[in-house]
Regions:
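Structural signature of the two symmetry-related core transmembrane helices
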Residues: 74-88, 271-286
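Short amphipathic helix-loop junctions that connect adjacent transmembrane helices
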Residues: 29-43, 225-241
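Helix-to-loop junctions at the C-terminal end of transmembrane segments
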Residues: 59-71, 155, 256-269, 352
């Protein structure tokens, strides 16, 4: 009976987007506990946290081909339990090297799930002729925000390992049920996969879209890794609720994504991108100048809102260039986006070790200015055909 379970494809894909980052959100809220438990300074923590993006960066060149070879269903069925398990293993890490290795493995699984999720969402958009990409990523933000808030609430109740085990155990059956009856759109178009590393084979418009996403994901990676540490620095080492800064960032990122699809239809892709990037710039200005927590929280909110629609707009644009190469284009976009995740956090960490996090955050401005400039290159989806 369960095997015949059927979902509305739009509700189903949004549910999967919500579940996928939930345990990650719990882990992000627990980073200050891991840092103090392993006695890591800011630069050591930055090095350890490079594990996840390094794993994703290693896998993404092949993720598009794997998605087409194995199919989205198999990747979901295998990827979710392995992904949840590897994140849970971070609770067993007893040093920088083990933490890096476990996060690397989580990054490998996460890359396959990320590409598969975005490719599937793009296919659902084309099949249903509904604009849903921003809302899908809104549910992703809602999932990571909920996980972060749960992690903040539970961090004093148990160990990092037990909290992660409880959350992963509760979410695994939910993820499995959501993936049952996943519609197959594999044959809607004949997908051609090209080698990701051969940049000249990709159109110039895709490169511009990737540059736009790069500036956005630097911010996302920086906030994911350092927002909780920023709040802890501001409130003191014994402070409670250090995950609320990232929780607010993720909440407003989710809010922006839920309204993003309608705004894109009414105002156009390029204008929406510009306005939101400017919001992120204003939020970052507040973060590097704030002297109290409440003002900093306003900065987190504006920054989260500002970067909210960036990656979804980039995914839709990349998937709309050529139906036959959507998996390759989305994989390449994800690769460049993950480089943003990889570059931002360690630079901030090393600067913070010498000065403070506010100085590190200043290094995020050039990426946002680059995204603002490249926002004019974004394109809108045209269902059932190519966008020239």
């Amino acid at each position: 009976m369960i095997k015949s379970l059927s979902w509305n494809p739009i509700i189903q894909v949004m549910g999967i987007f919500f579940i996928q980052p939930f345990v990650l959100g719990v882990w992000l809220a627990l980073i200050p506990e891991v840092q103090s438990g392993l006695n890591l300074d800011a630069s050591q923590l930055a090095l350890a946290l490079m594990g996840a993006p390094a794993g994703m960066l290693t896998t993404l060149p092949f993720a598009g081909k794997v998605a087409n070879t194995l199919g989205i269903r198999k990747i979901f069925y295998i990827g979710f339990p392995v992904y949840f398990f590897t994140i849970t293993l971070t609770g067993l890490a007893d040093g920088l090297d083990i933490l890096f290795l476990v996060l690397f493995l989580a990054g490998v699984c996460g890359s396959l799930l990320t590409v598969s999720l975005n490719v599937h969402a793009g296919r659902v958009e084309k099949h249903t002729r509904r604009v849903i990409m921003n809302r899908c990523h809104g549910f992703w933000s809602l999932g990571i925000m909920t996980g972060s808030l749960l992690g903040s609430a539970l961090h004093s109740e148990s160990t990092v390992l037990m909290i992660l085990i409880m959350c992963a155990s509760a979410l695994f059956p939910v993820a499995w049920l959501l993936c049952l009856g996943l519609p197959s759109y594999e044959n809607i178009t004949s997908v051609e996969v090209s080698p990701v590393f051969v940049i000249p084979q990709f159109p110039t418009i895709l490169i511009c879209i990737c540059v736009f996403a790069f500036g956005i994901t630097i911010i996302e990676g920086a906030m994911a890794d350092w927002a909780s540490v920023y709040v802890k620095e501001m409130l003191g080492p014994e402070a409670q609720g250090t995950g609320y800064g990232f929780g607010l960032f993720a909440a407003f990122m989710a809010l922006g994504r839920f309204f993003g699809d309608n705004l894109k239809i009414k105002l156009g892709t390029k204008l929406v991108a510009r306005v939101f990037v400017i919001s992120a710039i204003l939020g970052l200005i507040i973060l590097v100048t704030a002297d109290d927590l409440w003002l900093a929280l306003v900065g987190f909110a504006l920054t989260g809102m500002g970067v909210s629609v960036g990656f979804p707009l980039a995914v839709t644009s990349a998937a709309s260039i050529d139906d036959k190469r959507e998996a390759s284009y989305v994989a390449f976009l994800s690769l460049i986006a993950l480089i943003g995740f990889l570059v931002g956090p360690p630079i901030i960490g090393f600067l913070a070790n010498v000065t403070n996090l506010k100085t590190g955050f200043i290094m995020l401005f050039p990426g946002l200015l680059l995204s603002l400039f490249m926002s004019s290159k974004l394109i809108s989806i045209k269902t059932g055909g190519n966008v020239k």
